[in-house]
Regions:
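Hydrophobic alpha-helical segments, chiefly the membrane-spanning helices
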Residues: 1-350
């Protein structure tokens, strides 16, 4: 869709391009508001923590752009782009988006639920690295890279189904034992009037608006940047890198603005898990012979991913009932370090 938008805006007058940007922003904001409202309504109706709603339904929707981009890249013989999209999104979601969310507003932490999902996040990142290793030629991994076999990609998709199933089971258990968090307090503030199916459809509509709006916004902003003669390197480092993570960003900002920061936390952690199991998994499973892993991933991008996730893990462990401002600043600093390393260290581009 982005290519169609790019072809459409390239011949438009700058005023019309700015109008397209304004319209896309309006669609994104409306979609994010609808997404957050209906996610909270489902949380209250089902007695499920908002963090789990964010980690499952919402993150499944917001990671669709990454999945589409990575699968198409793998099909075109661009493994670096396919895997780089997934790993780059994990770094941006965790460092930039969650860091900004915790700076802008309050991100509550329900320790039992967050720790459970966070360790799955850590485990999935580690699993991605292990699955990429060429165990018969480990000495040359930094030169020749590795490969995620096709059957491993299929296994990732099976683990995705298991993750969603276990999340549903955990939510039911937490609800039954009263460990689902402050749901009762939410019921005093929010009174869902629609049937859960209607709320779910509205939530999906909100996700669609956010995703479609993002697909329109990025090419329009990129065209404006070109006309303003902004260097391509700056465009690549900002607009292109942020493009597929924009749904998570606007969802996080809308969530904390409305006082539902745990939804933002759940969306980011869930998106990280799905970027491994869904995005990388689908890319490898649909690529004959498996997904090649260029050597620069072992030299830079995998360590960067683990570094940012470790900062979040320490931030959660050192926080009580919310992700504190020091942890938020640490996440942003970690993100800046990883981006700077990508430009300063002598590694090949994705």
């Amino acid at each position: 869709m982005e290519s169609l938008v790019s072809a459409f805006v390239v011949d438009l007058h700058i005023v019309l391009v700015l109008a397209v940007i304004a319209g896309a922003l309006a669609v994104i904001v409306k979609g994010a508001d609808l997404l957050v409202d209906e996610a909270v309504a489902l949380s209250v109706t089902w007695g499920v923590p908002k963090m789990l709603i964010g980690a499952t339904i919402v993150s499944l929707g917001t990671t669709l752009p990454e999945t589409a981009v990575s699968v198409m890249a793998a099909a075109r013989g661009l493994p670096g782009l396919a895997l780089g999209n997934a790993v780059g999104s994990i770094i941006a979601d965790t460092g930039l988006i969650l860091g900004l969310a915790a700076i802008i507003g309050v991100v509550p932490i329900e320790k039992r639920v967050v720790n459970r999902q966070s360790w799955i996040q850590v485990g999935s990142a580690g699993l991605l690295i292990v699955a990429s290793l060429p165990f018969l030629s480990l000495r040359t991994v930094f030169v020749d890279g590795g490969r995620i076999p096709q059957w491993v990609g299929a296994g990732f998709l099976c683990l995705l189904v298991l993750y969603i199933w276990r999340s549903i089971a955990w939510s039911r258990r937490d609800s039954a034992t009263g460990a689902a968090g402050p749901i009762a307090i939410e019921e005093d503030r929010i009174h869902p009037t629609a049937h859960p199916v209607v709320s779910l459809l509205k939530l999906l509509a909100g996700i669609a608006l956010v995703v479609v709006g993002s697909q329109i916004l990025i090419p329009a902003v990129e065209e404006t940047a070109h006309r303003l003669r902004i260097p391509d390197a700056i465009i690549a480092a900002t607009l292109v890198a942020l493009g597929t993570s924009l749904p998570e960003l606007v969802t996080a900002i809308a969530a904390v603005r409305k006082g539902h920061g745990e939804l933002a936390l759940g969306n980011v952690i869930g998106a990280d898990i799905l970027n491994v199991l869904f995005v990388a998994g689908a890319s490898a499973a649909l690529t004959p012979g498996g997904l090649l892993v260029p050597p620069e991933f072992f030299r830079l991008y995998f360590p960067s991913m683990i570094f940012v996730i470790a900062v979040l893990r320490f931030g959660i462990s050192g926080s009580r009932d919310r992700l504190g401002r020091p942890a938020a600043i640490a996440l942003l600093v970690a993100y800046v370090i990883t981006v700077a390393a990508g430009y300063l260290l002598p590694v090949a581009s994705l």
